[in-house]
C-alpha cells in the first residue's frame, strides 16, 4: 500500500474550474485500487504554524501499488479533463510514503 499526500495551490478565481476537474478525477481513483482517505479545504484558522504557502486543498490517497497510482495518472477519462487542472492549479506538491 502506498500513500500519496498532495498539497494543492489554486490560481485565484479558478476554484470552480478546479472543482469541475475533481468531479471527474476523484471517482476514477477506485478504478485503480485507490481510495481517497481525506480531502481537506483548510480554513485560515486551521494553520497553527507554516513556513510554506498555505494550500487550497490537501488530499491523502492510498493505492495498493505504485503501478496502480501510475495507471490512475494515465486514465483516459482523467486525461480528457486534464486541461481543467492545468487551467486552475498553480502548483501542487506530492509526498509519497508507506504506513509505519
Q: Across the structure, where does each feature detected by a protein language model lie?
A:
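Short S/T/G/P-rich N-terminal loop/turn motif that feeds into the first structured element of a domain
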Residues: 1-74, 96-100
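A common structural junction motif
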Residues: 26, 77-83
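Conserved short beta-strand edge segments in small beta-sheet-based binding/regulatory domains
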Residues: 35-37, 82-97
